Curated annotation (Swiss-Prot):
It is found in: Cytoplasm. Its EC number is 2.4.2.7. Keywords: Cytoplasm, Glycosyltransferase, Purine salvage, Transferase. This is Adenine phosphoribosyltransferase. The gene is apt.
Length: 181
């Protein structure tokens, strides 16, 4: 992607200082999603590495990963798989617990969401420490998916999340980077 487009995408993301707590700068993609041109460019860029290849499913992490992942799945003519917080899916599920900054959480997926060997791309809006994305990768692998890559609009490289996924042999594609957390 050319530098002007990357700069335009970065400019389309609102930064909110001291949210949700002092010292944190929240990267709000709702402004990017609300700009039709920026949204289109972001989805096109997320799709680009996989155009012409076989991607069976795109998995999106609740909640912003649903928006981006659904659009990516549509463009790739792939199915979409939601990865949700525990208790939100109506059918038989498989779940995984993962660590948060203060405590733990659980996410789940329908047990029949992918077929063994399905090639899956994981999509979310942002990667920080990588704990949620790592849990999603492990959950997908647990039900037989081949996770071919993980894609994010935003990377906070100082927090090490992309490196954490690469250590699991998952290629990571991100569009823009922001310093700090």
């Amino acid at each position: 992607m050319d530098p002007r487009t990357l700069s335009a995408l970065k400019d389309a993301i609102r930064s909110i200082p001291d949210y949700p707590k002092p010292g944190i700068v929240f990267r709000d993609i709702t402004t990017l999603l609300g700009d039709p041109g920026a949204f289109r460019r972001a989805v096109d860029a997320l799709v680009h590495p996989f155009a012409g290849g076989r991607i069976d499913r795109v998995a999106g992490i609740e909640a912003r990963g649903f928006i981006l992942g659904g659009a990516v799945a549509h463009q790739l003519s792939s199915g979409f798989v939601p990865i949700r917080k525990k208790g939100k899916l109506p059918h038989t599920t498989v779940s995984i617990a993962y660590a948060l900054e203060y405590g733990t959480d659980e996410m789940e997926i329908h047990s029949d969401a992918v077929k063994p060997g399905d090639r899956v791309v994981l999509v979310d809006d942002l990667i920080a420490t990588g704990g949620t994305a790592e849990a999603a990768v492990n959950l997908l692998r647990q039900i037989g998916a081949e996770v071919v890559a993980a894609c994010f609009v935003i990377d906070l490289p100082a927090l090490g999340g992309a490196a954490r996924l690469r250590a699991l042999d998952v290629p990571v594609f991100t569009l823009v980077e922001f310093e700090g957390h």
